[in-house]
């Protein structure tokens, strides 16, 4: 059955592409595979040097020339050139990045599903996925499970980056750009020899923008503004006739905004009073007006060393990496509609918060909010005071929402030693060992807004200006041990067989750092998990064998058939301790949702099969590849977001079983010298087969997975004079309809279902049920255009990002028991100019 689905999906993809063939052709990478017959692309994604056309897997490669002509710097940009891959990044904070490859998503607050490898070194912090990694020279995106090569965080694939390596001549470059919204970018690098056999690359970058959106209440562009700078250094030295030492260091600093969300309600039985209570997420008009300026800070430092020694028959490679990423955010809260700070509880802190809430509501009565929300004469929820009450929604201009302060701090030390045959043999092999230690602290603090701003401490006593009402704060420790090996055997000159195996052991533990303290607003502990005493430490070990089998058969000199199968693995882990108690008290006991959330979430395991053909024709002027795939995922990790009277809660849950299958087709044609047409289509089908956490979702699609992606484009390089060319580049990306939650065409009870029977409206519980059929992001297309002139060592380029100003959603986070979704807008049109010089 699995094979039938795979071949059906492959055929569907081919038919769909054929229909579009009259409009445009495609290319293997959606970006570049080199200048056809003239260039041979060498890739390293499988830990060995291979010709692109010989790799027995789906892989996208962006060369240095393509990176320069597309203006690509970070993952959110190169993902748009890669079929079957989507990304959500920066909606909550800069380090909040989720990459989805063929239906396998990296759940927020869990480990990534995609390995990030930079200059041969594996990085483990998801916060680094969308960072500028230096002066890039090649990007490779390898699809399908790569756990046998890279281990625990490569279930969906691997992103392999190569940066500039110093040579024996002085070279350098600078590039600056200016665009709308006060957006400026500058980058520079210099590569110089320091002596015989030793060289240095030093690079830096700077980026600033006011962003697309404005906070109307504060009167400032503080919704998606950002400022980033970074510096990278790399020294490569020959310390012996067969030994190379590669040392790198990097520092980056980011500051800007966070939590760029509005809320949309999905309560159909309220639509008679106001149609906006049942709002399609795609129709929402975005307005921002929180009274708290949202902030986001991120500091990154990392240093690594890699040594390579070539013996007569084998090569020894060893590396070590230290990485430290500290992140924090402040923002408005979400508690106004649940009256956490509305009524005094007999403490000075609660009286002060209630007074501030009533005063700010009275001062802002009638202030225009996104419908159906409104500010009435009092902050009492509308259902309890229909004549004078309010429906605020989250992030209102009043103080009734409270505040939030979050930290995510991770330091890790990792190392690997590997010995491999020297290649170009009938039988190649490699063996290695890997170790990783992670220290991670995660804190989420909710406080009362007394109109005096946020104190950047996780716990603030009741007498302060920002007293804490709820706190999750935990210390997570992880140790990973792995052994791996692979063999590649040339069975015949046309038939290659590869076998790989990796065994990972991951020891995880968690300790609560929440102090024993009383919540001045509820009288209970500040963490619900402390209701029956201190939260005990927990530990768990996760283990997984990850095999991989691949084969390649040369049908002709220009066409290869390939197939591969492998196991992917993501370790289980711990939510903030006390999460299960919150969900049980607030939802299961109150409205009977019976959603299953645990303080421990299970490991994710996937089994994936892929088969395809890739090749070239017309003396290399036409390249193509066609692939079909099938993946079965057990215990898929999924991010859930809860809001209520308790504040907000972020957790990872498990979907018991998901099936994904689909097809992908890429084609690239050089029409004449200097004119390329390219395009690609990916079609993905998915189905939830079992989900004990939310049984009604069985039959729905895998969350965060687009039904399809289409890439179309062209590049023209035409000589204008003897010394310079005109360059035109157009890239059009269509992303298909996407569900972001397991609840899709489903009804679900909400907190309103529990509150309405006892409210002033005295309505039956079902009136508060939500309908989530209107939470699917619709398909959208984004056109990026670049036009300019380039000489041997200079370029001037005008560019348009999202040329047609297509409005779309970046992310939809459904808060199922709240009765709505938190939605974040995508980028708008931005025009600019770029100038570069190299020597």
Per-region residue spans from a language model:
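Solvent-exposed loop segments that connect transmembrane elements
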Residues: 213-222, 259-291, 332-405, 445-473, ...
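Outer-membrane beta-barrel translocator/receptor signature
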Residues: 96, 112-113, 125, 134-137, ...
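Membrane-embedded beta-barrel scaffold of Gram-negative outer-membrane proteins
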Residues: 304-311, 315-333, 554, 560-566, ...
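Structural signature of Gram-negative outer-membrane beta-barrels, strongest in the C-terminal barrel
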Residues: 236-240, 419-422, 428, 432-436, ...
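Gram-negative outer-membrane beta-barrel transporters
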Residues: 494, 623-633, 651-743, 834-838
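Acidic, small-polar-rich N-terminal luminal/periplasmic segments of exported/outer-membrane proteins
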Residues: 37-169, 611
């Amino acid at each position: 059955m699995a094979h039938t689905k795979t071949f059906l999906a492959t055929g569907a993809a081919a038919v769909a592409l054929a229909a579009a063939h009259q409009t445009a052709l495609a290319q293997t990478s959606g970006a570049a595979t080199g200048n056809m017959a003239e260039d041979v692309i060498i890739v390293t994604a499988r830990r060995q040097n291979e010709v692109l056309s010989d790799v027995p897997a789906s892989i996208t490669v962006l060369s240095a020339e393509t990176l320069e002509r597309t203006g690509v710097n970070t993952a959110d940009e190169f993902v748009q050139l890669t079929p079957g891959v989507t990304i959500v990044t920066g909606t909550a904070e800069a380090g909040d990045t989720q990459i989805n490859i063929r239906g396998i998503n990296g759940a927020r607050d869990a480990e990534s599903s995609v390995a990030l490898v930079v200059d041969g070194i594996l990085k483990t912090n998801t916060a680094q996925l969308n960072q500028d990694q230096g002066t890039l020279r090649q990007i490779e995106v390898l699809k399908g499970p790569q756990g046998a090569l890279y281990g625990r965080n490569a279930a969906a694939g691997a992103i392999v980056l190569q940066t500039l390596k110093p040579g024996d001549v002085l070279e350098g470059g600078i590039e600056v750009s200016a665009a709308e919204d006060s957006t400026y970018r500058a980058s520079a690098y210099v590569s110089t020899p320091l002596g015989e056999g030793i060289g240095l690359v030093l690079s830096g970058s700077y980026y600033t923008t006011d962003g697309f959106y404005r906070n109307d209440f504060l009167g400032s562009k503080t919704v998606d503004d950002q400022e980033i700078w970074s510096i990278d250094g790399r020294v490569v030295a020959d310390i012996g006739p067969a030994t190379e030492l590669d040392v790198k260091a990097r520092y980056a600093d980011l500051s800007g905004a966070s939590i760029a969300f509005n809320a949309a309600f999905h309560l159909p039985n309220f639509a008679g009073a106001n149609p906006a209570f049942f709002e399609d997420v795609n129709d929402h008009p975005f307005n921002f007006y929180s009274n708290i300026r949202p902030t986001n800070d991120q500091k990154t430092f990392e240093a690594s060393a890699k040594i390579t020694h070539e013996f007569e028959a084998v090569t020894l490679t060893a590396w070590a990496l230290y990485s430290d990423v500290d992140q924090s955010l402040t923002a408005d809260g979400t508690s106004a509609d649940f009256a956490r700070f509305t009524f005094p509880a007999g403490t000075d802190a609660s009286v002060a918060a209630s007074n501030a809430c009533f005063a700010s509501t009275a001062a802002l009565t009638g202030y225009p909010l996104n419908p159906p929300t409104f500010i009435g004469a009092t902050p009492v929820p509308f259902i309890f005071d229909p004549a004078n009450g309010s429906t605020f929604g989250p992030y209102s201009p009043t103080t009734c929402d409270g505040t939030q302060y979050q930290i995510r701090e991770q330091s890790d030390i990792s190392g690997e030693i590997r010995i491999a045959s020297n290649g170009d043999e009938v039988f190649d092999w490699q063996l290695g060992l890997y170790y990783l230690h992670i220290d991670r602290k995660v804190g989420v603090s909710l406080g009362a807004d007394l109109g005096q701003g946020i104190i950047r401490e996780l716990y603030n006593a009741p007498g302060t200006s920002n007293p804490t009402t709820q706190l999750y704060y935990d210390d997570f420790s992880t140790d990973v041990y792995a052994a791996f090996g692979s063999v590649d055997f040339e069975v015949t000159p046309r038939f290659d067989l590869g076998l790989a195996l990796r065994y990972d052991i991951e020891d995880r533990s968690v300790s609560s750092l929440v102090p024993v303290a009383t919540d001045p607003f509820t009288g209970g502990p500040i963490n619900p998990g402390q209701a029956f005493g201190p939260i005990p430490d927990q530990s768990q070990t996760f283990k997984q064998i990850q095999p991989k089998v691949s084969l390649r058969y040369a049908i002709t000199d220009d066409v290869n058939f390939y197939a591969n199968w492998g196991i992917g693995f993501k370790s289980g882990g711990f939510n903030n301790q006390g999460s299960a108690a919150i969900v049980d008290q607030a939802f299961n006991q109150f409205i009977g949702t019976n959603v299953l959330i645990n303080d421990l979430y299970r490991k994710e395991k996937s089994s994936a099969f892929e088969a395809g053909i890739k090749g070239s024709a017309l003396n290399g002027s036409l390249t193509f590849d066609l692939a079909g795939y099938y993946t079965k995922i057990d215990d898929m990790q999924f991010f859930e977001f809860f809001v209520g009277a308790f504040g907000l809660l972020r957790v990872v849950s498990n979907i018991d079983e998901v099936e994904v299958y689909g097809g992908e087709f890429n084609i690239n044609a050089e029409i004449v010298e200097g004119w390329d047409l390219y395009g690609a289509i990916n079609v993905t089908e998915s189905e939830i087969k079992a989900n004990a956490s939310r049984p009604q979702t069985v039959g729905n699609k895998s969350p965060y997975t687009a039904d399809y992606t289409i890439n179309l484009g062209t590049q023209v390089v035409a000589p204008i004079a003897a010394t310079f060319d005109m360059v035109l580049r157009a890239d059009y990306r269509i992303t298909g309809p996407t569900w972001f939650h397991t609840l899709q065409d489903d009804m679900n009870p909400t907190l309103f279902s529990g509150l309405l029977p006892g409210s002033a409206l005295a309505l039956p519980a079902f009136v508060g049920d939500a309908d989530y059929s209107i939470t699917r992001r619709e398909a959208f297309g984004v056109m990026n255009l670049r036009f300019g002139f380039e000489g041997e060592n200079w370029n001037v380029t005008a560019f348009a990002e999202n040329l047609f100003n297509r409005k779309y959603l970046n992310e939809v986070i459904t808060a199922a028991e709240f009765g709505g979704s938190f939605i974040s807008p995508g980028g708008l049109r931005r025009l600019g100019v770029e100038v570069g010089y190299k020597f």
